[in-house]
Amino acid sequence: MAGYDHDSRIVMTLDAGGTSFRFSAMRGNKRITDTVTTPSNGDNLKKCLGNIVGGFTEIKNKCPRPPVAISFAFPGPADYPAGIIGDLPNLPAFRGGIALGPMLEHTFRVPVTINNDGELFAYGEAIAGFLPYVNGLLEKAGSLKRFKNLFGVTLGTGFGGGIARGGELLTGDNSNASQIWLTRHKFLDKTNVEEGVSIRAIRRVYAEEAGIPVADVPDPRVIEQIAIGEVSGNRTAAVEAYRRLGEVAGNAMANALALIDGLAVIGGGLSKGWRLFLPALIAEMNDSYVAPNGESFRRLPQPAFNLEDPAQMKTFLKGKTRAITVPGLKRKIKYDSLQRVGVGLSRLGTSEAIAIGAYAFALRKLDALKR
């Protein structure tokens, strides 16, 4: 997958949070300006839009040459290709359809692309992060195997997702692709999976296991420290909170990879606790179904490997390569019979991956228009 490490074009981008907006500019997959931060004023549309225009104006003035595009992640629901933002829970001033993209195109006279953060995270990791990292290791190991497809998830306030397939971002016909958070919770069949894979899920399970009110539960970073013995608290409850997150996430991700058949990369604030949940996540992905006749079979035909585990990484890279004879000929060819998928952590960091994804998405769109 071609990257843009040496591209001289500049793209302005935005990290849109519920309380603040952070603006910057990218060139060659790197930030070239200081970050400009403004309040979101999400309950006042005029102020909110004014802050967005003002932030991009300030960044434009900091750029060494005129930007060629604006590209950023913004919450949904939205018609992202049209640049129209729908009714947002965290920015209540957005109601009835706000044509943010067309407004910015008119103001700055450059193309504007908007996507959700989970999709741009996956795209950034596919362009310059986890996907080329793993393929580089496979090449160095002399393996025949290469991956083209990547499923990215972010674990934090929610459970976000994105799919990069063969160098392209899968966005869907309604801007609703990769909505992993809407799949079913493994243990609560009337509940979506995000209630088991999020900050609130970690706190809720800790409260249940420790027998205390949720209001008295610390944040997940402290729960992580309790689990590894760095901070006093109910260690059993802390370990179970992260283990269960891994099991629930692994169930959802196994369903996704049954369709995608590629690598999976994990980002977001909760990914820092990977040592506590990744083993359970991988175990769930490698679990089996039971047929009506009592026989078991793998839920994924291809084994899933924890690529943060050196021993599993070694097996993953080695594969099972042997020489086979072409029927009717004396010629032999190499064959790697180990079908496999791998799961690992972001190599860029979540925010950086989103920014690189936004940069690459804008430039690919510009390049496509030239053809």
Regions found by a protein language model. Give the residues of each.
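ATP-binding/phosphotransfer module of carbohydrate and carboxylate kinases, centering on a glycine-rich
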Residues: 1-68, 80-82, 106-110, 139-142, ...
